[in-house]
């Protein structure tokens, strides 16, 4: 059973889960029926060498040319949805439309279901990244409990291992006899691990040279973590191609908000060192600032932190204003287009 004990890892798991749920909601419920597919069209009356134009369904235009048989010998997954709104060309009563209607009638040559593309690319990558990150959390927790961890205060006591607790409960309740073999084994493991951690912190290069298996385990853990985060962040950089005309602006903004938050959270978790234990050796810092210097130091830290918070607030507001100005026409078109 996996229990995410670290608040930092739990926040990342929650963000990835929320991001995946937003994508699933948009794919299943959020997309408008008229904005699910794109069509490669050519106006009626133009030459065959005229370049095809990709566009989404427009109720002011007439789309002709639904195929009577599946393209390329078979329907793609969910491709029939794209052709359901088209009108077969033979149903139109006139063969050559008037010139005034040439630009209102479009011959469809290909259709693509953009929700299918979204489902099989972004949603799948998010799901794979979610499972990989859970695998990283499991590996990290096992290493903190049984392996070499630096700094030493990040170690978790092996006595809290679930199998040890379950064995003690079963032996005391059902067997009416104390079972301590696993506890003694874990205590011996804890002593040996503390010695290994001291050797690692003293000379990590020599330690890993003589014990390459530990380096391989730590390397696999880091690779799984970076691959998981890379898949999540990579969903924002996937080329949308012609389907970009169907995806709403809020989906792009939501994607970048989640991706940037997840990336910054992971970067903060990597760079931030955990708090030192309460019973740490106080001899390492004999000179504690007191008096006027201590007061000045605390005041300076408070002032600098306040300035940093205000700068972040100004940066966020400026970013929102720049995005609004850049997408002003697009926002107006999506708000008032019928």
Swiss-Prot record:
Keywords: Glycoprotein, Host cell membrane, Host endosome, Host Golgi apparatus, Host membrane, Membrane, Signal, Syncytium formation induced by viral infection, Transmembrane, Transmembrane helix, Viral primary envelope fusion with host outer nuclear membrane, Viral release from host cell. InterPro entries: GK (IPR002567). It is found in: Host cell membrane; Host endosome membrane; Host Golgi apparatus membrane. The chain crosses the membrane at residues 122-140, 213-233, 244-264, 302-322. Residues 31-121, 234-243, 323-338 are extracellular. It is a multi-pass membrane protein. N-glycosylated. Its main location: host cell. Glycans are attached at residues 48, 58. It comes from the Viruses. Residues 1-30 form the signal peptide. GO terms for biological process: fusion of viral membrane with host outer nuclear membrane; symbiont-mediated induction of syncytium formation. Residues 265-301 are annotated as: Interaction with UL20. Residues 31-121 are annotated as: Involved in fusion. Residues 141-212, 265-301 are cytoplasmic. One of its GO terms (cellular component) is host cell plasma membrane. Glycoprotein that probably modulates membrane fusion events during secondary envelopment of cytoplasmic capsids that bud into specific trans-Golgi network (TGN)-derived membranes. Also plays a role, together with gB, in virus-induced cell-to-cell fusion (syncytia formation). Seems to block fusion of virions with infected cell membranes. Interacts (via UL20 interaction region) with protein UL20 (via N-terminus); this interaction probably plays a role in the coordinate transport of protein UL20 and gK to the trans-Golgi network (TGN), and is required for the cell surface expression of gK. Belongs to the alphaherpesvirinae glycoprotein K family. This is Envelope glycoprotein K. It comes from Human herpesvirus 1 (strain R19). The gene is gK.
């Amino acid at each position: 059973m996996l229990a995410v004990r670290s608040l930092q890892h739990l926040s990342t798991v929650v963000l990835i889960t929320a991001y995946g749920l937003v994508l699933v909601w948009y794919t299943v419920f959020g997309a408008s029926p008229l904005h699910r597919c794109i069509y490669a069209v050519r106006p009626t009356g133009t030459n065959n060498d005229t370049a095809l134009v990709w566009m989404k369904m427009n109720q002011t235009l007439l789309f002709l040319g639904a195929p009577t048989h599946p393209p390329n010998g078979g329907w793609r997954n969910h491709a029939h949805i794209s052709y359901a709104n088209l009108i077969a060309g033979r149903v139109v009563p006139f063969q050559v439309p008037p010139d005034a209607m040439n630009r209102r009638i479009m011959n469809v040559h290909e259709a693509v279901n953009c929700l299918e593309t979204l489902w099989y690319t972004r949603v799948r990558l998010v799901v794979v990244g979610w499972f990989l990150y859970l695998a990283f959390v499991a590996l990290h927790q096992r290493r903190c409990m049984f392996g070499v961890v630096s700094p030493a205060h990040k170690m978790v006591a092996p006595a809290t291992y679930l199998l040890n607790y379950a064995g003690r409960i079963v032996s005391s309740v059902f067997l009416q006899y104390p079972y301590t073999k696993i506890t003694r084994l874990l205590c011996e493991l804890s002593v040996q691990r503390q010695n290994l951690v001291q050797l690692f912190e003293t000379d990590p290069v020599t330690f890993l040279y003589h014990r390459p298996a530990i380096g391989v385990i730590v390397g696999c853990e880091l690779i799984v973590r970076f691959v998981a985060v890379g898949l999540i962040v990579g969903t924002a950089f996937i080329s949308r191609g012609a389907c970009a005309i169907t995806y709403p602006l809020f989906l792009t903004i939501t994607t970048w908000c989640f991706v940037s938050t997840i990336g910054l959270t992971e970067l903060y978790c990597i760079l931030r060192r955990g708090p030192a234990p309460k019973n740490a050796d106080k001899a390492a810092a004999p000179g504690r600032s007191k008096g006027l210097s201590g007061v000045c130091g605390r005041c300076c830290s408070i002032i600098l932190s306040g300035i940093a918070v205000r700068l972040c607030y100004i940066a966020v507001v400026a970013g929102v204003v720049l995005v609004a100005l850049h997408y002003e026409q697009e926002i107006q078109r999506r708000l008032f287009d019928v």
